[in-house]
UniProtKB/Swiss-Prot annotation:
Species the sequence originates in: Human cytomegalovirus (strain Merlin) (HHV-5)
Lineage start: Viruses, Duplodnaviria, Heunggongvirae, Peploviricota, Herviviricetes
Annotated spans, Disordered: 59-83
One GO biological process term: regulation of DNA-templated transcription
Keywords noted in UniProt: Host nucleus
Pfam families listed in its UniProt record: Herpes_IE2_3
A Gene Ontology term for the protein's cellular component: host cell nucleus
InterPro entries: Herpes_IE2_3
Entry protein name: Protein UL117
Family in the record: Belongs to the herpesviridae U84 family.
Job description of the protein: Plays a role in the inhibition of host DNA replication in the infected cell. Targets the mini-chromosome maintenance (MCM) complex and blocks the accumulation of MCM proteins and their loading onto host chromatin.
Superkingdom per UniProt: Viruses
């Protein structure tokens, strides 16, 4: 290794030092660059005694010997070729390949899903918690739901009765808060459910009154749906075909919470808190905050969220400024004025920023907002499914804004979602 000196390198160009900078002291750069040309052997990077940001190595014709050529051997110097590369300050040419290999080893791909439900793709005999991952199950589930036919006023049967159980208000004939004028034939119920699920039904399906319902050992995409018919109020004078929400329409709903993903029970408090806030406040006032201590895992979560529709994502690394304790006088003055809400404005004084440094804390943070309540809840569901894989890396928090915030392109979606009303009988 040859040390830096005028005998070994040739300074081709050097920019002047810039002493003044608006950056903090620990982030201030000298903005000085030199271009050097080695004359013999290797060159140490960075050169000794030079405060530079980048060093450019320029090949020369006299790099094999330090002795000047004789007069008879002098030839016109060919123009210098452009530098092949620019090495950052502190880079060693000898360790450059090792550095690249180290950087490549850091490019770790995190698999955000693991086998969870269903059957193993290679071994169908394996079933249980270590068989199918949630992403495959949710994809197949949503694909199956999209295939179902949504009944409208024209295609719905003439007499349909849907019982939603004891969860809906009682005292209404027909069950589930449906109008009393709806037919109560069990054959029509089975036919409607089969038409929604797309399963052929026998001509005369007879269900015994004392039949017992057994829990299937695995998820069946054709057995855990039930149709919910939204009837137009009887007081509406308009015809059902042109009534509110397009008249009588049948939608597919899950049968119960047994088919929820496994992470739903683990992060139950998060879903309940988001649902509570969205019942009390508008979706434009609720935001989801995620913190992560690993940059690669944070980028994996960010990439997954950016594949969702109708969401806004703000992500970055947390910065902390210079830490300075408060004087007892400042603490006493602040607490004295803030004891009385009517005297809060009396303690406001001009603030002079005096922090001389800042640095990164190593924590990555992300704020997610949705165009509608459903979009925000979908973002929470996706985050919970990914965070569940690495609970020691992520942290989920729900924040309530004092002023609503929504992206301008999301306004039409928001207005359409909020204008939809479920008709009551």
């Amino acid at each position: 290794m040859v040390m830096f000196s005028q005998d070994h390198v040739q300074i081709v160009y050097g920019s002047t030092r810039i002493c003044k900078s608006l950056a903090p002291a620990n982030k201030r750069k000298t903005h000085r660059t030199i271009v050097v040309a080695p004359r013999r052997g290797f060159l140490r990077i960075p050169p000794d005694g030079q405060d530079v940001n980048h060093v450019k190595i320029v090949p020369t014709t006299t790099s094999s010997s330090l002795a000047p050529p004789r007069d008879d051997e002098r030839r016109p110097t060919p123009p210098l070729r452009p530098p092949l590369t620019v090495y950052p300050y502190g880079t060693s040419l000898i360790r450059r390949s090792a550095r690249d290999a180290k950087l490549r080893s850091k490019l770790i791909v995190f698999h955000i899903t693991r086998p969870a439900l269903g059957q193993h793709p290679q071994n169908p005999g394996i079933s249980g918690p270590a068989a199918m991952d949630h992403s495959e199950f949710l994809t197949s589930f949503r694909r199956e739901v999209d295939r179902q036919t949504v009944l409208t006023a024209e295609s719905a049967p003439a007499t349909v009765e849907v019982c939603l159980g004891d969860a809906l208000p009682g005292g209404v004939m027909g069950g589930g808060g449906l109008p009393a004028g709806v037919g109560s034939a069990s054959a029509a119920v089975a036919a409607a459910a089969a038409a929604v699920a797309g399963v052929p039904v026998a001509a005369n399906p007879v269900m015994p009154a004392t039949a017992t319902v057994t829990t299937p050992p695995m998820i069946d995409l054709t057995s855990h749906h039930r149709p919910l018919t939204l009837f137009t109020p009887a007081s509406a004078a308009a015809a059902p075909a042109v009534a509110t929400n397009g008249g009588n329409a049948t939608y597919i709903l899950p049968a119960d919470c047994r088919y929820a993903p496994l992470f739903a029970s683990k992060y139950k408090y998060v879903f309940e808190e988001v649902s509570r806030l969205m019942r009390l406040h508008d979706s434009t006032a609720v935001q989801l905050q995620i913190s992560a201590s690993c940059g690669n895992a944070f980028q994996a979560l960010k990439s997954a969220l950016l594949k969702l529709h109708n969401v806004t994502v703000l992500a970055g690394q947390q910065l902390i400024t210079q830490t300075m304790p408060h004087t007892p006088q400042a603490v006493a003055t602040f607490k004295f004025f803030h004891q009385d809400p009517n005297r809060v404005l009396d303690c406001i004084r001009p603030v002079v920023p005096r922090s001389t440094s800042y640095h990164e804390t190593g924590v990555y943070q992300m704020w997610v907002s949705g165009a509608t309540k459903k979009d925000l809840f979908d973002a929470v569901t996706l985050c919970a499914s990914i965070v569940e894989k690495q609970p020691d890396v992520f942290n989920i928090n729900v924040s309530l804004l004092t002023y609503p915030s929504i992206a301008a392109p999301h306004l039409p979606l928001y207005n359409e979602f909020t204008s939809f009303r479920l008709p009551t009988s």
